[in-house]
Each structure stands twice: as C-alpha cells, then as structure tokens.
Amino acid sequence: MHKLFVPYVMGNRDFIENVKTLSEAGADIVEVGVPFSDPVADGPVIMNVGNKAIQEGVNIQYIFDQLTENQDEIQSKYVLMTYYNIINHYGELAFLNACEQAGVYGLIIPDLPHELVQQLKARHPERKTNIISLIAMTTSNTRSHQIAKDAEGFIYTVTMNATTGEDGKFHPELKNRIKDIKAHTEVPVVAGFGIRTAAHVKDIIEASDGVVIGSEIVKRFENDDKQTTIEYLKTIRNVLN
C-alpha cells in the first residue's frame, strides 16, 4: 500500500528548487516552513536555516510569489507550516486568498490550539485551503478523538514529546495511539518529529499512513550535493511504496 511521503523544507531563497527536487523524488505533500523569529516548535537545525532565511530577506510574500509562479511545475501537493502571528499580520482572509492563488493545499499552524483552529475554520467557510491538525502524544484520548473527527486534509501526529529532529526512540504507545486516532477520522494520519532513517520509517508506517521528515532533509539540502540528497529521498520513497 502506498504510504505518504511528506518532506519538509524551509522557505529560503532557493526553496522552490528544493520543492521541485522533492516533488520529482516522489513526495506526496511537501511541507514548506515559513521563517519566523520565534519558532517554538522547531529544533536547532530548522531554527538555524529559518534565521538564515530571515537574514536573506525571505518573508511570506516571497514564498507566495514563488509558489504562484511555479505551481504548474510542482506535481506534489504542498502545505505551509506557519505561526499564527504571520497569518494575523497579513490578514486572515487575504492570507487564505493568497494560499488559494498559490495552490497551497493546507496550513499547519503549530501555535494554534484546536479550539482556535475550529474558530478559524468557522470564520472562513468558503476557503479551499485545508487547516491541518496536529496531535501530540500528550493529548488526552477524548481530545485527540475530537481533533481527529474535525480534521481535514491529513493529521500530523507528533511522535515524540520534544521539538523536531532530536534523536530518541519513538513513544512506546505511539503505534497504538496512531491506530486509535485513525479509527476516529476519515483523513490520513502521518507521523513526524524525530524521523530520520529508512529504519525509522519502516517502523512507524506499521501504524501510520505516512511520515513527515524535517530536520534530516533540511540538513541534507544544506550540506550534501543534490545527487546524494536525491539518493536518500529515493530510499525513503522505496520504503513507503
């Protein structure tokens, strides 16, 4: 069964080329991080490239413009990971309209709790962009069932009680939790945070519908040549097929 490959890239000066590379390597959905000065959910690797992107003058408008201009060349769906402050500053309606124009499939807003996500959805019933739900391992069953029921696009389960990309084992209850969440939703459930290797992927997709890989891919785009990165992406894609 085909599982979803959801790689993450930081929206920096050359992010659009990275998005195209990921798309060609078989990404189902590419997650594009919007650089932000206080990224509470990001580990050191992503924080560093985010700071660099801010210094390069990258902002949300640059990301929208690049996606709008290049959307016909990108086969994968793509979502933005952004903090609510950026949306609020831009104006919710204007932001959602810009997303639609740029072909954005969904938004992940890590600092917006479920109740506020639901209010945001209710304020914009006409929007075409999905608001993607996050569920952490610390979330109670009752609450995670509610989030799962309300979800659209896909659900992003946080596999570790930590920020992204830190080493460590997956939560022992993780697979059971993912199966439980899947039983309460119509949308795919993908797992992310701390996934790096083909072995990690193989382990987690016993329960999940796919994986999000962030820090590892960001690091490879920063440090490796393109061909080495493509080989890595293919290994992950093969495990997911």
Swiss-Prot record:
Pathway where it operates: Amino-acid biosynthesis; L-tryptophan biosynthesis; L-tryptophan from chorismate: step 5/5
The active site is formed by 31 (proton acceptor), 42 (proton acceptor)
Name the top EC class: lyase
**From the UniProt record, which GO molecular function terms apply?**
tryptophan synthase activity
Keyword Amino-acid biosynthesis in annotation: yes
SUPFAM superfamilies recorded: Ribulose-phoshate binding barrel (SSF51366)
| UniProt xrefs under PROSITE patterns | TRP_SYNTHASE_ALPHA
Q: Which UniProt keywords apply?
A: Amino-acid biosynthesis, Aromatic amino acid biosynthesis, Lyase, Tryptophan biosynthesis
The lineage's top-level taxon is: Bacteria
What Pfam family is a match for this entry?
Answer: Trp_syntA
| One cellular-component annotation, GO | cytosol
**Keyword check for Amino-acid biosynthesis:** yes
Q: Which reaction does it catalyse?
A: (1S,2R)-1-C-(indol-3-yl)glycerol 3-phosphate + L-serine = D-glyceraldehyde 3-phosphate + L-tryptophan + H2O
* EC number(s) stated in the UniProt entry for this protein: 4.2.1.20
Quaternary structure annotation from Swiss-Prot or TrEMBL: Tetramer of two alpha and two beta chains.
Protein purpose? The alpha subunit is responsible for the aldol cleavage of indoleglycerol phosphate to indole and glyceraldehyde 3-phosphate.
Query: NCBIfam families per the record?
Result: trpA
Similarity comment: Belongs to the TrpA family.
Q: What is this protein called?
A: Tryptophan synthase alpha chain
The source organism is: Staphylococcus saprophyticus subsp. saprophyticus (strain ATCC 15305 / DSM 20229 / NCIMB 8711 / NCTC 7292 / S-41)
The gene for this chain is: trpA
